[in-house]
Amino acid sequence: MSTDDEARPAARLTVLAGPSGSGRESVVEFVRARFPSVWVPVPATTRPRREPEVDGEQRVFLAPAEFERRVAAGELLEWSRIGEYRRGTLHPPLRARLDAGQQVLLPLDVTGARLVRVRLPDARLVLLIPPGRRPDAAVATAFAHTLTHDCTDRVADELVGLLGSTHPDPAWSRVRG
């Protein structure tokens, strides 16, 4: 093993979860600007492509039958139904990035994060909550870290720190903010 390998943090999946309106996407944009090597999976969906979306960039657009085939084959790490459409995270590209040593940041809702925990118990779950709100105790216990989104810069900096962390998560939950 080289010195470079020893200095590099072990690749890990970090799930940034929060309720609708918590600002997950804003935080992810700020994190990507600070930590360009982090990989953010492109979600798969059965909804039609909208202009100016490009297949494989903003979303991977799948026919409903293809989505079902991938679910049956275990190729979706997690998935959900939103209205008449489905969306999910393709597992093979995510696994390939982790196996290659790349840090992965996956923004999801709380339900999606819990589904990831079942399939990948070593994933680091980070709960993002809006200012002035406290997470439900039952929800908070599933997460290693809780961040209050009162300042996108601060939250992004803390998340970048977690992404670069080589140590395992503490057994206790941290509430910041």
Predicted regions located by residue number:
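Hydrophobic packing residues within well-ordered alpha-helices of enzyme cores
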Residues: V31, V116, P135-D136, L159
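Short glycine-/polar-rich loops that comprise or flank the Walker A/P-loop
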Residues: P36-V38, L120-R124, A140-A144
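Conserved phosphate-donor/acceptor-positioning beta-strand/loop module used by diverse small-molecule
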Residues: V104-V110, V118-D136, T148
